[in-house]
Amino acid sequence: SKYYEQVGKSDKEITEEIAFDLPNGWYWCRLKDICSIFTGATFKKEEATITRKGIRILRGGNISPFELKIKDDDIFLTKDKVKEDILLKENDILTPAVTSLENIGKMARVDSDMSDTTVGGFVFIIRLHLINRWFSKYILYLLSSPFMIDFMKSITNKSGQAFYNIGKERLSMALLPIPPLTEQYRIVTQIEKLFEQLR
């Protein structure tokens, strides 16, 4: 079967981009169609402090697979240096934009609004249009899958000796398999059961 994408008023064939056929009720969509992707605060080194006052800035080292870690050596910026719309919200998904090869695809989800925290300029915030816990967890696990990590590695550019840069535009064009909401719930609960067994 052939797959098409509507671009403006015309249809473009994308069969070659489709990795596999999907079960009934599932559909393919581009990441850009379900979220906004943006980076965090940019600042000069001398503007950052470790005083624990103001807005906490999380960096790549704060992101572990499926877990956001608050650290003792986190840096802070004064509130006037941080735009309100980049403060972390529940269901945001965070991933390093510039990182080492083995850390490409490392993702963490924000469990509740963090009105005094954002990320630095080398971290992506993936903010979903649909505010739903199961959907954000499904997207988190999907983006962390070997299938998606391979895609992310394929779109990186090497920057410097050991760092890789994930292009926002190319990431936004990723094709994702999306199941119905009831199926998302089943997939997420099954994955979380397996995580419990591994703990």
What spans do the regions from the language model cover?
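Sequence-specific dsDNA recognition surfaces
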Residues: 7, 11-17, 32-47, 61-93
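Amphipathic alpha-helical coiled-coil/heptad-repeat segments
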Residues: 145, 149-150, 154, 168-199
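Generic, well-ordered alpha-helical scaffold segments in large soluble proteins
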Residues: 34-41, 94-97, 129, 142-146, ...
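A short glycine-rich beta-alpha junction/loop motif
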Residues: 116-124, 158-178
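Non-catalytic DNA-recognition/assembly elements of restriction-modification systems
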Residues: 12-41, 178-189, 196-199
